[in-house]
From Swiss-Prot:
One of its GO terms (cellular component) is extracellular space. It comes from Ovis aries. This is Pancreatic polypeptide prohormone. It is found in: Secreted. GO terms for biological process: feeding behavior; neuropeptide signaling pathway.
Length: 78
């Protein structure tokens, strides 16, 4: 069982093949305009993927405020 697990982990494709984008490689200073345009497009997609908003995650401050306000043990202002 352990041996088969190790073999399965070793045979997995690299992260880039699983959908996780790898940073595009700079084509060099002597690249053609077409190569630079392709690099710019790939870099833009890569940056957009890294900076996309993460929906469904709460910030800790907002969650803590909500929990404190709804607590029956919180002090009532007079």
């Amino acid at each position: 069982l352990l041996l088969s697990t190790c073999v399965a982990l070793l045979l997995q494709p690299p992260l880039g093949a699983l959908g996780a984008s790898l940073e595009p490689e700079y084509p060099g200073d002597n690249a053609t305009p077409e190569q630079m345009a392709q690099y710019a497009a790939e870099l833009r997609r890569y940056i957009n993927m890294l900076t996309r908003p993460r929906y469904g995650k709460r910030d800790k401050e907002g969650t803590l405020d909500f929990l404190e306000c709804g607590s029956p043990h919180s002090a009532v202002p007079r």
